[in-house]
């Protein structure tokens, strides 16, 4: 069996994630639910989400909507306390180089700026930015596919792309632990919110005892651990929150 919290995992918060998992694990076991001793930090995301022995996973809402809805049980979302954002949701922030003359994300799209994205199955890196552009009657000009949000930030800083959109929580962590990179960048806008990284378990499991164990664990989590993780709550979102049209895949020039 496997448990993983991969979406905001970094070396700097690995011990904090493990401490949170220990509390969740004990809560699950107290409810007669099997749970592994420790988190898995090595299994690729897609493989972990598809495991028939998945105890707890964390998935971006776009791959959930596109490929895993009906294949896993949705539990809820951690709340990371983003300003001007509903609990349990998140948004992307657009960035350019600090010395770029663009005043807004609209300026970037209208000028045909080259857009770095982590992958086409990322809500924050591609899905939400594309929806933002479509709502403005604009289009993105896809550039390098970087494979990771931080790599997209690096692509912009190094001039391999003109702008990018990154998960606001990932950006907040990069500002904390990679300030030499983020100091080269400037935020110029944001997308609409959508469901945050969603906690899931294997298909056929009732979500309620998992949600109860997670809520209980957060109540017991030491404040200094919660501060490292940036987690301030847990929310179970309705299915309607996930009723979002799927984006078209990027079509690089």
What are these regions (language model features)?
Residues 2-23, 86-153, 226-240, 244-245:
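Bilobed "Venus flytrap"/periplasmic-binding protein-like clamshell domains
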Residues 1-73, 77-80, 84-89, 223-253:
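N-terminal hydrophobic or amphipathic helices and topogenic motifs
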Residues 43-48, 149-155, 161:
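Short, hydrophobic alpha-helical packing/hinge segments within bilobed ligand-binding/sensory domains
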Residues 124-126, 152-155, 172-175, 196-198:
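Short acidic/glycine-rich loop or secondary-structure boundary segments that cap or lie
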Residues 2, 76-79, 84-91, 179-215, ...:
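Periplasmic-binding protein-like
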Residues 52-54, 90-92, 112, 196-197:
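Short, surface-exposed beta-edge/turn micro-motifs
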